[in-house]
Amino acid sequence: MTQSNPFQQYGITSGLAAAAAAKASVLAAMGTISDYVGVPTPIGLRIEVKVEMMKQIDARSGIAAVRKFSGDNPDTLNGALFESRAVIRDDGLINIFAGEGIGVAVSDGLPVRRGDPAINPVARMMIENAVREVSGSAGFDVYISVPGGEDLARDTMNPRVGISGGISILGTTGIEEPVSGPDYEAHIEYLLQTGRCVSTVAVMCPGNTAMRFAESYLRLHPASFILTGDRIGSAIEMAIEKGYREIVVFGLPGKLVKMAAGVMNTHSRIADARFETIAAYAALNGADRDTISKILSSNTVESAFAVLRSIGLLDSVAGAIASRIVERLRSPVWQIRRILLRHDRFRRQAIRVSPVAGHIETGE
């Protein structure tokens, strides 16, 4: 599937991949072999999914496999093989079992009960609906597995949120968007819901680099750290709704500067305003026309900061921008009582903003 922008591709969620594999294995058990299976989604669309392998084992069972495709979304599970084995039952019941590579809930507060397989309710519904499309009056035991899933899960949020031993089968729409869209927002909400069980602090990190550095910098429970992608504003709103007492925004300047301009979805397709924002605050702090021109001609925020550093204005401009971000996030729209905003660029430059007055420290 392709967005209106031909360079951006949608993918399928782990829930849809599992549903496609399950349906294919049921068809195989019934003696029908096909290269593709159609799977219904909760949003009313039907998705045709390519079947990697499909085989009837005997008159009562079949196996099939589907390879997950994540489109342009950076996803640990892209290319992972979802396998399913279906065995006919005589009582008409459809039972879904988790096999190799599927995690188990080991914490409370998750969408599934402690001790149950990490197959979320909507994903389980998708699997059952896909199977029932072709099962007729027959029942089936369906066993889903992801070879190597335990290793893949180490690079996901599962160890943080209380899923052990493998991946989760997720998805609210069946469709994986290439940027932080509604399906990813559901994932953020899931992380915030589970994190709230163990922490009152939510650390919003727009990217993996910020996430890794935040984890090394802040002494907090692992579930406190939320990878928001571009949906920082939505993540903050959800954290407020879920009763977090403190929200930390921790990221690199390319994302954070946009927030000073009120841009809370930081994807470049939505808005930019980085250099205009830096230039405006540089002008307010005494920068001349030549400096403003250099900032507006910069290719990166770091290069714009270098211009300011060369004339001794970096601290004052960065402080003003940081104060404005804090002001934005403290507005009645957000209703946040306390904000701690941090930016750190490892050893090159560090900016830290206090929650009291937007005080800023910069240094090499």
From Swiss-Prot:
The keyword S-adenosyl-L-methionine applies. It catalyses: Co-precorrin-5B + S-adenosyl-L-methionine = Co-precorrin-6A + S-adenosyl-L-homocysteine. Transmembrane segments: none annotated. Pathway: Cofactor biosynthesis; adenosylcobalamin biosynthesis; cob(II)yrinate a,c-diamide from sirohydrochlorin (anaerobic route): step 6/10. It is an enzyme of class 2 (transferase). It holds the Pfam family CbiD. One of its GO terms (molecular function) is cobalt-precorrin-5B C1-methyltransferase activity. Its EC number is 2.1.1.195. NCBIfam families: cbiD. Belongs to the CbiD family. This is Cobalt-precorrin-5B C(1)-methyltransferase. It comes from Thermoplasma acidophilum (strain ATCC 25905 / DSM 1728 / JCM 9062 / NBRC 15155 / AMRC-C165). The gene is cbiD.
